[in-house]
Amino acid sequence: MDTKFDDVLTGEQKLRNFNINFGPQHPAAHGVLRLVLELDGEVVERCDPHIGLLHRGTEKLMESRTYLQNLPYFDRLDYVAPMNQEHAWCLAIERLTGVAVPRRASLIRVLYSEIGRVLNHLLNVTTQAMDVGALTPPLWGFEEREKLMVFYERASGARLHAAYFRPGGVHQDLTPRLIEDIEEWAEHFPKVLDDLDELLTENRIFKQRNVDIGIISEKDILDWGFSGVMVRGSGFAWDLRRSQPYECYDEFDFQIPVGKNGDCYDRYLCRMEEMRQSTRIIQQCLAKLRVEKGDVLARGKLTPPPRGEMKTSMEALIHHFKLYTEGFHVPAGEVYAAVEAPKGEFGVYLVADGTNRPYRAKIRAPGFLHLQAIDYIAKGHLLADVSAIIGTLDVVFGEIDR
């Protein structure tokens, strides 16, 4: 007898896997992340990320805008630390045009790149703690982020979408008062990190949720193309600020924190230590900025003339008008410029055809490659561990979907 009620008669149940949607409206899903999870009981069998919910066609839009008009698009990629993305775009243009950035502008860029790193890691470490049940860290972390956002605003006029780094330098100089305030913040900040450390690092619950979860080996790093903390947490001391120094990073004294086990906990420890190292770089930057005065924009075809000059010189006025209507022309060629963004290696592959618009710009977002591997990393873990793994991948959908 072969009927559909056989299993009822024998008492044997046919087990089937359970499919659930994780996100896009889930408290632990970062932004518009959607995962389709296949569960066997509470064990993850398959984890399928669905991307594209924040796709805006950035790379295509960039082909119809001038180089300067494209700059603000980079703020909208990884919107947690916007200036780090602008940096890659400016470096790409400067390499093709052969423009040398003034010394003071270079120092300001390093300063704000490191402030961006602290902004990013503060958000990541504290929200990762919240994902696994600790509610205090986000409140403390956001208090510090607020101070840094104010520094962004005082430099560029905007808290988030700064458009402060420009091809040839930075938009405007920092005031002496702002430099003093950043210095004061940098003195007090390590105390905040110590408080966070005390709450989380040896916390039994936090360790149970993160130790030996989402382990990544050397082979995985090379297979999936990881970068940033995902690499350093597994014991590779790979940091573009050291291995391929750009701007003036080779002048600074800082260390690169490296993990041992490549699990969520080691990546958390790396991010905490990176914030301390960033604070060191910030303090060294400020000391140099006090001494080294000068221009913050390379005067030439890429940058506008000084205001005063425009009131007396017709040529300066014409240059200003042409720069903001037609934009500058970049010589034909191709270049790949990468920076060590907080999430990993953020790169721009720029192809120029000699006009005032890029022929093609390919954006290499680190988070995209990290999210690709979520199925591989999460397989065999429990459902509750998925949110810990996502927290430690550090994904932001502005740059993944772009």
From Swiss-Prot:
Pfam families to which the protein is assigned, alphabetical: Complex1_49kDa
Chief location: membrane
EC class: translocase
UniProt subcellular location: Cell inner membrane
GO molecular function: NAD binding; NADH:ubiquinone reductase (non-electrogenic) activity; quinone binding
An annotated GO cellular component: plasma membrane
Membrane topology of the entry: Peripheral membrane protein
InterPro entries the record matches: NADH_Q_OxRdtase_suD (IPR001135), NADH_UbQ_OxRdtase_49kDa_CS (IPR014029), NDH1_su_D/H (IPR022885), NiFe-Hase_large (IPR029014)
This enzyme's EC code(s): 7.1.1.-
Keywords tagged on the record: Cell inner membrane, Cell membrane, Membrane, NAD, Quinone, Translocase, Transport, Ubiquinone
Superkingdom of the organism of origin: Bacteria
Segments forming a coiled coil: none
Catalytic activities: a quinone + NADH + 5 H(+)(in) = a quinol + NAD(+) + 4 H(+)(out)
Function in brief: NDH-1 shuttles electrons from NADH, via FMN and iron-sulfur (Fe-S) centers, to quinones in the respiratory chain. The immediate electron acceptor for the enzyme in this species is believed to be ubiquinone. Couples the redox reaction to proton translocation (for every two electrons transferred, four hydrogen ions are translocated across the cytoplasmic membrane), and thus conserves the redox energy in a proton gradient.
Family to which the UniProt record says this protein belongs: Belongs to the complex I 49 kDa subunit family.
Subunit structure comment from the entry: NDH-1 is composed of 14 different subunits. Subunits NuoB, C, D, E, F, and G constitute the peripheral sector of the complex.
Protein name: NADH-quinone oxidoreductase subunit D
Gene: nuoD
